[in-house]
Design a protein with these regions (language model features):
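Conserved alpha-helix/loop element of class I SAM-dependent methyltransferases that forms part
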Residues: 17-35
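Conserved SAM-binding loop of SAM-dependent methyltransferases across substrates and taxa
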Residues: 46-58
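C-terminal catalytic and target-recognition region of SAM-dependent MTase-like enzymes
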Residues: 147-183
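Non-catalytic substrate-recognition/targeting regions of SAM-dependent transferases
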Residues: 1-15, 24
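Mobile active-site "lid"/loop adjacent to the S-adenosyl-L-methionine
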Residues: 67-69, 91, 109-139
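Conserved SAM-binding motif I beta-strand of class I
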Residues: 59-64
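Conserved class I S-adenosyl-L-methionine
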Residues: 34-45
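S-adenosyl-L-methionine
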Residues: 66-112
């Protein structure tokens, strides 16, 4: 994968290198599945996870509220020679997009979400992780296929511990019943 690095006004570079281990895990799961995999990447940012999944052979729907970030992700796909891979690039509020996917009946075999602590959607929607993550997980669970491969959530919000995220996912019943208690 080739990722374009450039400093932003938020002192980010467009890449979180610590995510490479997750990208490798996604690729391993997709390649080992032996079937076509549809991935939904919410809060897709500059596309590292999207590119990893595309490179492994999955089709991806990449969603981010920032038009600039989606454009950057597309540039990263071009730099990685992945523009011929099946990817939908969507600029939208993640929760609103998932609600529409539920109405459309679209299903995904894998979900990746890396929500920010705080953000604004393209229509001025306010996102606060601690206020909105449970509802988003509840919605997103509804777009999982009958044979989901994985549901990955990354979070660096200081006020929300990994134990709280794990509790939310278990409370929603995403683990166990759908994944056979394997992950």
């Amino acid at each position: 994968l080739t990722l374009i690095v450039s400093p932003t006004g938020f002192k980010h570079t467009g890449v979180f290198p610590e995510q490479a281990v997750n990208w490798a895990w996604y690729q391993e799961k997709i390649r080992a599945s032996g079937r076509p995999i549809r991935v939904l990447n919410l809060f897709g940012y500059t596309g590292g996870a999207t590119l990893a999944c595309l490179a492994a052979g999955a089709s991806v729907t990449h969603v981010d509220a920032s038009k600039g970030m989606v454009a950057w992700a597309r540039e990263n796909a071009a730099a990685s020679n992945l523009t011929d891979r099946p990817c939908r690039w969507i600029v939208d509020d993640c929760a609103k997009f998932v609600q529409r996917e539920i109405r459309r009946g679209n299903k995904y075999d894998a979900v990746i979400m890396d929500p920010p602590s705080y953000g604004r959607g393209p229509g001025g929607e306010i996102w606060k992780l601690e206020d909105n993550v449970y509802d988003l997980i509840t919605l997103t669970e509804q777009v999982l296929s009958d044979k989901p491969l994985f549901f990955a959530i990354n979070s660096y919000t200081e006020g929300l511990s990994p134990a709280v995220m794990e509790y939310i996912v278990k409370m929603e019943g995403i683990t166990g019943k759908k994944f056979g208690d394997k992950e």
